[in-house]
Amino acid sequence: MGTGAFPDGIAFDEYGNLWGTMVYSDKIWVIDPDGDYKILYDGGDPAKVKALDDAFYESRVTNEILFATGQGIAPWIASVCFGGPERDTVYVGSLRATNIPSFKVPVKGLPMVHWYDQY
C-alpha cells in the first residue's frame, strides 16, 4: 500500500470493492475483487508522511513527527461508511476534524449488518 500505509476503517460496496482509509497519510483507497488497488483521495503531505513512515520503522516516532501529519478536509482519516437513502454517499470519519465530510459515489455500499433483525 506504499509509504504511510496505516490502514484503518473499511467498508464494502455492492460490487465487492473494499474501501478504506489510511489514518496518518490522509488517504481513501479501494481494492476491487481482482485485487487492484487505487487511491481515491490523498490529502496528506508526502514529505511529512514519509518522515512518519521512516520514524515508525526505525522506532523513533515523536509527537512532533506524528502531529505534523493530518491535514486537508479530514485530518487523520479514520473511517468510511456508506449512507443516505440510496447508500451512495460516503461519510468520512476523522480523528482531528470538527465535521463529517461526505461525497456521492456511483456505487452503493453494502448495508450494515446491524440494520436488520435477521442478523
Predicted regions and their residues:
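Active-site donor-binding loop signature of nucleotide-sugar glycosyltransferases
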Residues: 1, 42-43, 105
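Beta-rich, blade/repeat-based domains predominating
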Residues: 1-20, 25, 49-51, 60-89
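Short secondary-structure boundary segments
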Residues: 22-23, 43-44, 93-94
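Loop/turn residues immediately N-terminal
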Residues: 24-26, 97-98
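Short loop/turn segments that connect beta-strands within beta-propeller blades
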Residues: 31-36, 104-108
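Beta-propeller fold detector
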Residues: 38-52, 111-119
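Outer membrane beta-barrel transmembrane domains
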Residues: 54-56
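Blade-level signature of beta-propeller repeat domains, shared across WD40, Kelch, NHL, RCC1
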Residues: 76-119
